[in-house]
From Swiss-Prot:
Gene3D superfamilies: P-loop containing nucleotide triphosphate hydrolases (3.40.50.300). Pfam families: DEAD (PF00270), Helicase_C (PF00271). The gene is DED1. This is ATP-dependent RNA helicase DED1. Residues 406-550 form the Helicase C-terminal domain. Its main location: cytoplasm. ATP-binding RNA helicase involved in translation initiation. Remodels RNA in response to ADP and ATP concentrations by facilitating disruption, but also formation of RNA duplexes.
Length: 627
């Protein structure tokens, strides 16, 4: 990693004699879990191996341009069948669950299934398999991350995984996943949810937010058992499912990722997870529902569709989770979310727990989100700015016409790991992918215009190392956890600084280190001020050209920012009920601290939010490509 940063620090974007496009021989990155397997060709980027190059389109098959190297493989979606409560499942007399790897609920007790060595290997891998990334060399630094929690009677944080408050079976699964201790967001979210409180959690990317809601929800589910099906359920010719936990995510990829994590932590339990999203066969999803669903991961559009078809009832929902909640609301999913929360048979806000997680919560989004919460705790983990010091951020001044050549120089300096490149448009993603393939790189693309099958195959190829470069639009920017991404490149800098935060957070996750490189020119001056602030807060180098352009923009435009709705960056990780005040409330200098520190002497909450802000007038139109 240090080699990458060092090579980049010596990079001159004006130097066209770097040899980036020469026929150099470079070693192809092979993930640890596929090393030693038979490979065809030399594995040389420039050597046109594995059908990359030569006949550049030979590996596209019937896919459209931008397909790159995307053969199917491990990582394909399982719709809840097989060993996770599908066709092998059965309901025995007096019990709930069954099957080869499903536990049962019998006479008020949870009876876990027997261990399954093959399934454990598939779910959790082995300790040396870095494709199952858990924590890195800087994981212990999380103990020093500042934490602020505001609200009435905030519960004390935990310092380690133990029972109570966590269920013993869940602890076994956490150990199988090689999670040795909770991250700061998990230290606080577990007792907060266990206490029956609603939660709005803002934590930097790669900090364990998925475990932050899965652990407490599953722990309670394992202990309390399934809810009884309403008597009226048998009066319909359509067999409905009655999940007790619903997790909403903005994209298909994030929903699938959450589902994959849920499969790990529901191993041997009675809880049957399932995922539904648009772009895949709704008939197949309906068929899988016949085998039961207790924890449902869904995108808003597909869940709305299934509700209208009356295949799902939300009457038994105890937990509603909105992951990347700010993004869902900002993307225009508010009508679907309101239809799900307020227009269905879901219990009212007073009769369920609602949890919202994201890396950023601008105050305007907090106002809107408070409609769905009651007496909630606002949790802010990490410094305002929400980027990790595990990520080395590099800003290069690159004019648009120089971007391709500069990109080749960067890729030549990156000797190992996976590279994720972000562009702004779908057309740019396809064009850049084709360019990289022509240059001999193993690249593929993911964006909203590709079919779901193409997107899944592209992600599979990238995760397994068959494609070492993934070119993506914002569809992959939020929440995705792809192991071994060592370099993120913002080929196009987004207009919103929060999107920048989420993009670079695809590397440097769970205490691992990473590099994020951004191409900047005067066309991006509207975000210069906040970019300087972000770099300074994360102890990163601020190039002189960026400071100069920031001053130019401030003098000419009064320092106003572009992007969505003109949000104030300073409030994106602070409870809006506090009026943006930096003092007061509860705070901790680190996630492991058992006390709340001296937060200004306040012992109470910050008042009750009225929550009735109505519909957002500035939400963007919903794009069906997201759901």
């Amino acid at each position: 990693m240090s080699d990458i940063a060092e090579n980049m620090s010596n990079l001159s974007v004006q130097d066209n004699d770097s040899g980036a496009t020469s026929g150099d021989s470079r070693r192809s990155y092979v993930p640890p879990h596929v090393r030693g397997q038979q490979r065809s060709g030399s594995g040389n980027y420039r050597g046109r191996s594995d059908n990359f190059g030569g006949n550049e389109r030979s590996f596209f098959g019937n896919e459209r341009r931008g397909g790159g190297y995307s053969r199917g493989g491990r990582g394909s979606v399982n719709w809840g069948g097989s060993n996770w409560g599908g066709r092998n499942d059965s309901r025995g007399s007096g019990g709930y669950g069954g099957g080869n790897s499903s536990g049962r609920w019998i006479d008020g007790k949870h009876v876990p299934a027997a261990k399954n060595a093959n399934l454990e290997l598939e779910l959790f891998g082995v300790a040396e398999d870095k494709s199952f990334q858990s924590s890195g060399i800087n994981f212990d630094n999380y103990d020093d991350i500042p934490v602020e929690a505001s609200g009435n009677d905030v519960p004390e944080p935990i310092s380690e995984f133990h029972s109570p408050p966590l269920d013993p079976l869940l602890l076994d699964n956490i150990k199988l996943a090689r999670f040795t201790k909770p991250t700061p967001v998990q230290k606080y979210s577990v007792p907060i949810v266990a206490a029956g409180r609603d939660l709005m959690a803002c934590a930097q990317t790669g900090s364990g937010k998925t475990g932050g809601f899965l652990f407490p929800v599953l722990s309670e589910s394992f202990s309390s058992g399934p809810a009884s099906t309403p008597e009226a359920a048998g009066n319909s010719y359509i067999k409905k499912v009655y999940p007790t936990a619903v997790i909403l995510a903005p994209t298909r990829e994030l929903a699938t990722q959450i589902y994959d994590e849920a499969k790990k932590f529901t191993y041997r339990s009675w809880v049957k997870p399932m995922v539904v999203y648009g772009g895949a066969s709704i008939d197949n999803q309906i068929k899988q529902m016949r085998y039961g669903c207790n924890l449902l991961v869904a995108t808003p559009g597909r869940l709305t569709d299934l509700l209208e078809r009356r295949y799902i009832s939300l009457a038994n929902v105890k937990y509603l989770v909105l992951d990347e909640a700010d993004r869902m609301l900002d993307m225009g999913f508010e009508p679907q979310i309101r239809r799900i929360v307020e227009g269905s048979d879901m219990p009212s806000v007073d009769n369920r727990q609602t949890l919202m997680f994201s890396a950023t919560f601008p105050s305007e989004i907090q106002h809107l989100a408070s409609d769905f919460l009651k007496d909630y705790v606002f949790l802010s983990v990490g410094r305002v700015g929400s980027t990790s010091e595990n990520i080395t951020q590099k800003i290069l001044y690159v004019e648009d016409f120089d971007k391709n050549d500069t990109l080749l120089d960067l890729l030549a300096a990156s000797n190992e790991g996976l590279t994720l490149i972000f562009v702004e448009t779908k057309r740019a993603a396809d064009s850049l992918t084709d360019f990289l393939i022509m240059e001999g790189f193993k690249a593929t693309a993911i964006h909203g215009d590709r079919t779901q099958g193409e997107r899944e195959r592209a992600l599979s190829a990238f995760k397994t190392g068959r494609a070492t470069i993934l070119v993506a639009t914002a569809v992959a920017a939020r929440g995705l956890d792809i192991p071994n991404v060592t370099h993120v490149i913002n080929f196009d800098l987004p207009n919103d600084i929060d999107d920048y935060v989420h993009r670079i957070g695809r590397t440097g996750r769970a205490g691992n280190t990473g590099v994020a490189t951004t191409f900047f020119n005067r066309g991006n001056k509207n975000v210069a001020k906040e970019l300087v602030s972000l770099l300074s807060e994360a102890n990163q180098e601020v190039p002189s050209f960026l400071t100069t352009i920031m001053r130019e923009a401030s003098s000419g435009r009064g320092g106003a920012r572009g992007g969505r709705g003109g949000y104030n960056r300073g409030n994106s990780t602070r409870d809006f009920r506090r009026g943006g005040a930096p003092s007061g409330g509860f705070s901790s200098g680190g996630g492991s601290s058992g006390g709340w520190g001296n937060g200004g002497g306040s012992s109470g909450g910050w008042g009750n939010s009225s929550g009735n802000w109505g519909n957002s007038s500035n939400s963007s139109n919903s794009n069906s490509g997201w759901w």
